[in-house]
UniProtKB/Swiss-Prot annotation:
Name of this protein: ATP synthase subunit b 2
GO molecular function: proton-transporting ATP synthase activity, rotational mechanism; proton-transporting ATPase activity, rotational mechanism
PANTHER family noted in UniProt: ATP SYNTHASE SUBUNIT B (PTHR33445:SF1), ATP SYNTHASE SUBUNIT B', CHLOROPLASTIC (PTHR33445)
Family: Belongs to the ATPase B chain family.
Subunit structure: F-type ATPases have 2 components, F(1) - the catalytic core - and F(0) - the membrane proton channel. F(1) has five subunits: alpha(3), beta(3), gamma(1), delta(1), epsilon(1). F(0) has three main subunits: a(1), b(2) and c(10-14). The alpha and beta chains form an alternating ring which encloses part of the gamma chain. F(1) is attached to F(0) by a central stalk formed by the gamma and epsilon chains, while a peripheral stalk is formed by the delta and b chains.
Organism, as annotated: Xanthobacter autotrophicus (strain ATCC BAA-1158 / Py2)
């Protein structure tokens, strides 16, 4: 039999090393697969092994948020609130100013109204007094005129009455003289007849 030649020593050693590495990799993969099948899966936020990193990121996030709020958002909000407060204060001051002006105008109007009312009452009183004085003067003038007219009328009546009585006396004297002459058959004295008529007229006026 012809003997086969042996492979070189370096080639044989290299093949053996590669085979060992492949076997180790397969064993590691098999072990990892078995370990993965043997352990339970967890929700990442609830995984206790990641708590430290989660707390770190939480602190960093809140720190950045606080820095952003304190440097950007809060100053803006503060300025807005301050501007709003100043605007409200200005509006309140303006409203108070308008209120004071309105109250002053109302007081001035009421004062002017009271003065006008007092002046109107004074004018009305003066007018009433003047009309009363004029009416009194007219009344007195009318009464004086009526008194004069009444006196004139009384004088006229008295004169007419006197004249009428004179005629009546003459008629009475003539009638009495005729009656007495007829009764006694003689003519009485004229003076006696006139005296008798005058006595009769006086008694009549007294009655």
């Amino acid at each position: 039999m012809v003997a086969q030649a042996a492979p070189p020593a370096g080639t044989a050693g290299q093949g053996t090393h590669e085979a060992a590495s492949a076997a180790h990799g397969a064993a590691a993969a098999h072990g990892a697969a078995e370990e993965g099948h043997g352990k339970k899966s967890h929700f990442p936020p609830f995984d206790a092994t990641t708590f430290a990193s989660q707390l770190l990121w939480l602190v960093l996030s809140f720190g950045l948020l606080y820095l952003l709020m304190s440097r950007v958002a809060l100053p803006r909000i503060g300025r807005i609130l301050e501007e709003r407060h100043d605007r409200i204060a200005d509006d309140l001051e303006e409203a108070a100013k308008h209120k004071a002006e309105s109250e002053a105008a109302q007081a001035s109007y009421e004062k002017a109204l009271a003065e006008a009312r007092a002046k109107a009452n004074a004018i009305a009183g003066e007018t009433r007094n003047r009309l009363a004085a004029d009416s009194e003067a007219n009344r007195k003038s009318l009464e004086a005129g009526l008194a004069v007219k009444l006196a004139t009328a009384e004088q006229s009546i008295a004169s007419t009455k006197t004249e009428a009585l004179t005629h009546v006396r003459g008629i009475a004297v003539d009638a009495t003289h005729a009656i007495v002459s007829t009764l006694i058959g003689s003519s009485p004295a004229q003076s006696d007849v006139e005296k008798a008529v005058d006595v009769a007229l006086v008694k009549k006026d007294a009655a």
